[in-house]
């Protein structure tokens, strides 16, 4: 018998995470690696757990993630967004808790492009008065 799975897609900066929630004992696997090996920073692991803590479902679901693009912070944010969206499929009554914690909002902040004549997005070349 096929077991039920819940899907959610999360995005942050240039990262995209495809998240699957499967009823289980709380294992988190990212790109076929244990999440503690994949994300070396404890603070970012807390970010990933936020939706599960907000809905008091930590330890009820195994989280299986495919994520690509960006760095550690962007990927952690994308996973958080995907987990929150997948939890809505589990039970729509989680929406108020997730929304009040701000976990359903796609963070729109992106890297600003470099402009010609400047060294970066806003950094100008050194100015010499004389």
Curated annotation (Swiss-Prot):
Biased composition (Basic residues): 111-130
Keywords associated with the record: Ribonucleoprotein, Ribosomal protein
GO molecular function: RNA binding; structural constituent of ribosome
Superkingdom of origin: Bacteria
GO cellular component: cytosolic small ribosomal subunit
Positions of the UniProt region annotated as Disordered: 109-130
Matching Pfam families: Ribosomal_S9 (PF00380)
Family annotation (InterPro entries): Ribosomal_Su5_D2-typ_SF, Ribosomal_uS9, Ribosomal_uS9_bac/plastid, Ribosomal_uS9_CS, Ribsml_uS5_D2-typ_fold_subgr
GO biological process: translation
Family: Belongs to the universal ribosomal protein uS9 family.
PANTHER family for this protein: RIBOSOMAL PROTEIN S9, SMALL RIBOSOMAL SUBUNIT PROTEIN US9M
Protein name per UniProt: Small ribosomal subunit protein uS9
């Amino acid at each position: 018998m096929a077991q039920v799975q819940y899907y959610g897609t999360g995005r942050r900066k240039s990262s995209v995470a495809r998240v699957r929630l499967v009823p289980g004992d709380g294992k988190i696997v990212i790109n076929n690696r244990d999440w503690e090996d994949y994300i070396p920073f404890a603070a970012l692991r807390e970010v990933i757990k936020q939706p599960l803590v907000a809905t008091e479902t930590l330890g009820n679901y195994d989280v299986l993630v495919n994520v690509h693009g960006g760095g550690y912070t962007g990927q952690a944010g994308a996973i958080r967004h995907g987990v929150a969206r997948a939890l809505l499929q589990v039970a729509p009554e989680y929406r108020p808790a997730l929304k009040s914690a701000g976990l359903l909002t796609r963070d729109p902040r992106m890297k600003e492009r470099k402009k010609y004549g400047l060294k970066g997005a806003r950094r100008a070349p050194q100015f010499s008065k004389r």
